[in-house]
Amino acid sequence: MSFKGRPAFTAYSAGSYPAGAVRPEALRQLEFAHLPNQGLRSKSWDEFAKPGAPQMNFVFTVCDNAAKEVCPIWPGQPMTAHWGIPDPAAVTGTADDVERAYRDAFMMLDRRIGLFLSLPMASLDGLAIQNEITRIGRQ
């Protein structure tokens, strides 16, 4: 999102239960897509709910499990939507199976980000934007 959406959007990534390190498979997907993958770290979404955190306009949960969790109260009341994808870190099997799961997750997110970035934000009101980001998560 930060790369494709600049300068309008700056994206952050965090999770409800961070693993402590960014998975190498995730870093490889970024590399394959020619996206920056340096300096990334595993972090809790609580980091973005604290005073002094960057102001969020949109928050997208992506882990299928996150839809059932209680999310933090985000400062500034950003629009939220669930864009669930199967957790590639939960995949077992061969190295090819795991790599395929990460590739599939990347492709799903990339498609949704593209749809989001194509929204005519300036001509939509808040309710219409909320409806659109929710619809994108169902695709």
What residue spans do the PLM features occupy?
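Conserved active-site segments centered on acidic
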Residues: 1-50
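Structural signal for conserved beta-strand scaffold positions within catalytic alpha/beta enzyme cores
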Residues: 13, 61, 81-84
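Alpha-helix C-terminal capping/helix-to-coil transition sites in glycosyltransferase folds
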Residues: 54-55
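Phosphate-binding/catalytic loops
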Residues: 70-139
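Short glycine-rich anion-binding loops that position phosphate/pyrophosphate groups of nucleotides
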Residues: 64-67
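Generic detector of well-ordered secondary structure
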Residues: 32, 62, 110-111
